[in-house]
Amino acid sequence: MLKVNADFLTKDQVIYDLVIVGAGPAGIASAIYGKRANLNLAIIEGNTPGGKIVKTNIVENYPGFKTITGPELGLEMYNHLLAFEPVVFYNNLIKIDHLNDTFILYLDNKTTVFSKTVIYATGMEERKLGIEKEDYFYGKGISYCAICDAALYKGKTVGVVGGGNSAIQEAIYLSSIAKTVHLIHRREVFRSDALLVEKLKKISNVVFHLNATVKQLIGQEKLQTVKLASTVDKSESEIAIDCLFPYIGFESNNKPVLDLKLNLDQNGFILGDENMQTNIKGFYVAGDCRSKSFRQIATAISDGVTAVLKVRDDI
């Protein structure tokens, strides 16, 4: 059983059994199971509830739904959670301290939240191209969310960078809206599911640029041209484009917990054992921010459930 020394708290401050950071599939699953176990818990979510799936056009691999849009699935999950009337802080987490066996969570609205345990389920952040003017053109021709911004480019020319499932899925989606979709991939072979690739290859308004990387973003007030460089012979070419959607992977969203000195893998993802317990007692990790081999909706939910059941047993 976890013993908490909370002598530094004032009498009107609540100390929760559990605070869950993130309301994606992992966090929502944790919260549902936690509420059913009668844990006194709270959730912190500074972005759209539902997590990364709300930026996905179509989900076809989640049991119970042959085909469902990402926003619809995220809303279904979140409405299920809301039926339990949880405490939710709709704020961004700034940092976490650990004092006298109590976790202190600082939010961007100056609120401070106290808890015996934490399940950290913040998912991942989109990896940027890392080239000049990328931040400058964000919202002016650079977007990391096709489902959010595709309608702005109806009948126009767009590009997608990447070769995984996300890139291929969003290229398929954009092909139904844009005049032309340029798919830019640094390799000859895609990492995406073969069925998705075959589907994309059958779409007439998709142009493939394989063995190519984005070298330069060109434009004045907005993005106008993308310069590509061949990974084979270094030759360069240019594409006139209205918007570029990079889908080149993700990075761990670990900035608020770096001061805790959690054990991380070489890519910055948080290490947890089979029960999602980190090297700090009472601090658990679940979902895509955890170091693991596979990142799917189903695996995130499994992480979240495992973590909260361990919390239930330890409280």
UniProtKB/Swiss-Prot annotation:
Keywords: Cytoplasm, Disulfide bond, FAD, Flavoprotein, NADP, Oxidoreductase, Redox-active center. It comes from Mycoplasma genitalium (strain ATCC 33530 / DSM 19775 / NCTC 10195 / G37) (Mycoplasmoides genitalium). Its cofactor is FAD. GO terms for molecular function: thioredoxin-disulfide reductase (NADPH) activity. Its EC number is 1.8.1.9. Disulfide bonds join 145-148. GO terms for cellular component: cytoplasm. This is Thioredoxin reductase. It comes from the Bacteria. Binds 1 FAD per subunit. Homodimer.
